[in-house]
Amino acid sequence: VLMPCYNAAATLDEALSSLVQQTLPDFEIIAVDDGSADATSGILRDWASREPRLRVLSCSHAGIVEAINFGLQACTADYIARMDADDLARPERLELQAAYLDAHPEDCLVSCRVAGFPDGQVREGFSIYIDWLNSLLSDEDIRREIFVESPLPHPSVMLRREWLQRVGGYQEHGWAEDYDLWLR
């Protein structure tokens, strides 16, 4: 799991808790503190002292693309699951996604449905976007809709490290790094 963190003290404990509850037994968490000015660094150090799967990296604040690419260099697994420090993962997420990629070697990534939270605080426009994302259930759906908007919620994706390296990793072009990656 590759998780960039920037001023994430308010949400980081919940995000990490959801990861350590995964049903997949063998995985690593690479958390990159992107020069946070809040308590993010201390929270990560505390978690790392009691969670052997967590490796914490720190860099000066340069933005999400630089933080992700910095963390990518430390990833050793064949599959990389993306998650942000303000996201939660259902316990079976990693296990199901890894099983899918194992069974489908022709696919470079897999995503999953998402939900907005906390309940009652998700704005109407974002709720409509989430409904649209969750309606894309097949490769054909994604291919048809890819030029409408980014059809894959980045923090829900697991991808093959080899594919990610082959297409040039994450690139900074002034627009969404995930959408840029999907278009390549």
What residues fall within each predicted segment?
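Short, acidic, metal-binding catalytic loop of nucleotide-sugar glycosyltransferases
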Residues: S17-D26
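Conserved nucleotide-sugar donor-binding catalytic segment
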Residues: Q73, Y129-R184
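Short beta-strand/loop segment that forms part of the nucleotide-sugar
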Residues: D26-G35, R55-C59, A85
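Conserved donor NDP-sugar-binding/catalytic core segment of glycosyltransferases
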Residues: E92-F126
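A conserved acidic beta->alpha catalytic loop
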Residues: S18, D33-G42, D84
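Acidic helix N-cap motif at the loop->helix transition within catalytic regions
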Residues: A10-D13, D38-D46, L88, E92
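Short aromatic/hydrophobic "clamp" motif used to bind/position activated sugar donors
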Residues: I80
